[in-house]
Swiss-Prot record:
InterPro entries: ATP-dep_DNA_ligase, DNA_ligae_ATP-dep_bac/arc, DNA_ligase_ATP-dep, DNA_ligase_ATP-dep_C, DNA_ligase_ATP-dep_cent, DNA_ligase_ATP-dep_CS, DNA_ligase_ATP-dep_N, DNA_ligase_N_sf. GO terms for biological process: cell division; DNA biosynthetic process; DNA recombination; DNA repair; lagging strand elongation. GO terms for molecular function: ATP binding; DNA binding; DNA ligase (ATP) activity; GTP binding; metal ion binding. It comes from Hyperthermus butylicus (strain DSM 5456 / JCM 9403 / PLM1-5). The keyword Zinc does not apply. This is DNA ligase. Optimum temperature is 75 degrees Celsius. The lineage of its organism: Archaea, Thermoproteota, Thermoprotei, Desulfurococcales, Pyrodictiaceae. Keywords: ATP-binding, Cell cycle, Cell division, DNA damage, DNA recombination, DNA repair, DNA replication, GTP-binding, Ligase, Magnesium, Manganese, Metal-binding, Nucleotide-binding. Its cofactor is Mg(2+); Mn(2+). It catalyses: ATP + (deoxyribonucleotide)n-3'-hydroxyl + 5'-phospho-(deoxyribonucleotide)m = (deoxyribonucleotide)n+m + AMP + diphosphate; ADP + (deoxyribonucleotide)n-3'-hydroxyl + 5'-phospho-(deoxyribonucleotide)m = (deoxyribonucleotide)n+m + AMP + phosphate; GTP + (deoxyribonucleotide)n-3'-hydroxyl + 5'-phospho-(deoxyribonucleotide)m = (deoxyribonucleotide)n+m + GMP + diphosphate. The keyword RNA-binding does not apply. Optimum pH is 8.0. Its EC number is 6.5.1.7. ATP binds at E266, R273, R288, E318, F358, R435, K441.
């Protein structure tokens, strides 16, 4: 069975007009009920704004604004200049294409012409979801000599056949600017309602998605085989598992108490988290954001081939840059410098790496994610053949807060960021895709009153003054609220940027600039331009404070006030983190409460 693409385009238009998550959920439920089970995966990918999961490492569409305008020019029989002028006026290529196409339709109707572009203004066309998807996939996959002309011809054909509304969303999809404001959590809930019988089944959908990070595939299994099939899903080598995340505390006594009185405490390395998969001689390496980064680490591939003794395995670790002269750890930025190099092999000796392993999730057909940490660690020790650059993370088991503190100081002295404390009781499972109190990170910034850095998402930008006039000079930052699947404003940051950072800002933000407040953004402060929540930055500040204008934790501490950061300062970009990996509103609330307790203790009178 097929489904008209117009059904999808109409839903996109509805989603674009609303900001309330409950209304978005209703529209998705309505759409999924109309969708044939055989194509639900393609519909989910379209909503996510992608053709396939990032981790598959398949080519992207490879079409920039210029090629899109050229294709539209061919399809609409108008000059590229005419389209460019309208794009400049509207700031939206998709809207410009829709407007021109609608005007041409109306003119044709007025003179009674029946051309191939004549479609009812409501948006009916002969396009199906499958045809649009398959054509876009062909555009992405075509390579080699003459590929540009083939891409152009295929895209022009799609735009010519599409209705005005369909053309708008095809153009936006191609540009990577679909921006429906729908998060994965809302998609999963809608799938649970339609195919699982109720929203309560979302936990089953989420568990499957966490183990097989392909929401389209999960949706298709659910729609064609039912909820029980999802319950039986296990990890698969070559398909990334969504990583388990940690909470944060900065008091060893509290950490030990929270973890049940005893914990495994490991170095927290300043590197890139990696999930390494092995099947025979085949190795995959996935980033924290589930991108396939295997090609960036040929040295790690060789380490894994030699160092994992199991035939099939999924292990987790941290890739850390090492000084070739001293063997000491080098900062995260050095690793990112290596990743930006086109010829990675040329810098292998200049920027060598070591891998520190801390978990194993799957071995020879056995799913270990529901096993307690000690059992997983025991398997890790059995299957890993250690060397100087491939070894298990430094760690101790302790129930003593003082021993934890001493180990933390040793970690800092050795060049680590801090430590990660982990529960080792019977319930210490691997919570794929979730942040919880089974893992707690403990790191400290000695130069600041604020006890830790935070990872915030860019939701807006402000133009600078003076020599920065006309260019971006400050950013509006937000925390993630998983309960509402929204981003709440925390602070405006304009300090800490190097000249190089500022020069790159305009180009970095350009693909994500929005002409209106994004649907998932909750902010009273209005920036000069809105930015789709995509980019993550590490921020430090003097202290957490209350603010009447920021929406993070609004009303949680005091009526009419949210939590903000006083004197925020940019530290670095976090390309390894997605927006949903950012510091959460609950984390900031807990940090604020701990700060208050610390201040009260410091101000308390001593002696008599």
């Amino acid at each position: 069975m097929s489904m008209p693409f117009s059904v999808l385009a109409e839903t996109f238009e509805k989603l674009e007009r609303v900001t309330a998550r409950t209304q978005m959920l209703l529209y998705l439920v309505e759409l999924f009920k109309k969708t044939p089970p055989e194509i639900i995966d393609k519909v989910v990918y379209f909503i996510q704004g992608k053709l396939w999961p990032d981790w598959k490492g398949l080519p992207e569409l490879g079409i920039g604004e210029k090629m899109l305008i050229k294709a539209a020019s061919i399809a609409l029989h108008v000059s590229e200049k005419q389209i460019e002028q309208l794009v400049k006026k509207l700031g939206d290529t998709g809207k410009a294409i829709e407007m021109i196409k609608r005007e041409k339709q109306q003119k044709q109707k007025a003179v009674g012409l029946l051309a191939f572009m004549q479609k009812p203004s409501g948006g009916e066309s002969t396009l199906t979801v499958e045809k649009v998807y398959d054509t876009l996939a062909r555009i992405a996959l075509v390579q080699g000599e003459g590929s540009r002309d083939i891409k152009l011809k295929l895209l022009a054909g799609l735009l010519a056949e599409a209705s005005p509304r369909e053309a708008k969303y095809i153009a936006r999809f191609v540009e990577g600017r679909l921006r429906l404001g729908v998060g994965d959590a809302t998609i999963m809930e809608a799938l649970a309602v339609v195919y699982g019988g109720s929203a309560a089944m979302r936990s089953v959908v989420e568990r499957a998605y966490n183990l097989r990070a392909d929401l389209g595939m999960v949706a298709k299994i659910l729609a064609t085989q039912g909820i029980d099939a999802l319950k039986n899903i296990k990890p698969e080598v070559g398909v990334p598992i969504r990583p388990m995340l940690a909470e944060r505390l900065n008091d060893p006594v509290e950490i030990i108490k929270k973890l049940g009185g005893r914990a495994l405490v490991e170095y927290k390395y300043d590197g890139e988290r990696a999930q390494i998969h092995k099947k025979g001689d085949k190795i995959w390496i996935f980033s924290r954001r589930l991108e396939n980064i295997t090609h960036m680490y040929p040295d790690v591939v060789e380490m894994a081939k030699k160092g994992i003794k199991a035939e099939e395995a999924i292990v987790e670790g941290e890739i850390v840059a090492i000084d070739p002269e001293t063997g000491e750890f080098r900062p995260f930025q050095v690793l990112m410098h290596r990743r930006r190099k086109k010829d990675v092999h040329a810098v292998l000796s200049e920027i060598p790496v070591a891998v520190f392993l801390f978990d194993t999730l799957y071995v020879n057909g056995e799913d270990l994610t529901l096993k307690p940490l000690p059992a997983r660690h025991e398997v890790l020790e059995k299957i890993i053949e250690q060397s100087d650059t491939w070894r298990i993370a430094e760690g101790i088991v302790t129930s003593d807060p003082q021993e934890l503190e001493s180990f933390f100081l040793k970690a800092i002295e050795d060049g680590a960021e801090g430590v990660m404390a982990k529960a080792i009781h019977d319930r210490s499972i691997y919570q794929a895709g979730a942040r919880g109190w089974l893992w707690i990170k403990y790191k400290r910034d000695y130069k600041s009153e604020m006890s830790d850095t935070v990872d915030l998402v860019v939701i807006g930008a402000f133009y600078g003054k003076g020599r920065r006039g006309g260019k971006f000079g400050a950013l509006l930052m937000a925390a993630y609220d998983p309960d509402t699947d929204t981003f709440k404003s925390v602070c405006k940051v304009g300090s800490g940027f190097t000249d190089e950072d500022l020069e790159r800002l305009d180009d970095m933000l350009k693909p994500y600039i929005s002409d209106k407040k994004p649907a998932r953004v909750d902010s009273q402060m209005k920036p000069d331009v809105w930015v789709e929540p995509t980019l993550v930055a590490e921020i430090i500040g003097a202290e957490l404070t209350l603010s009447p204008i920021h929406t993070c934790c609004y009303g949680w501490v005091k009526s009419g006030a949210g939590i903000s950061i006083r004197f925020p300062r940019f530290i670095r970009w976090r390309p390894d983190k997605g927006p949903e990996d950012a510091t959460t509103t609950k984390e900031l609330y807990e940090m604020y409460k701990r700060q208050l307790r610390r201040i009260k203790e410091e101000e308390a009178p001593t002696g008599v």
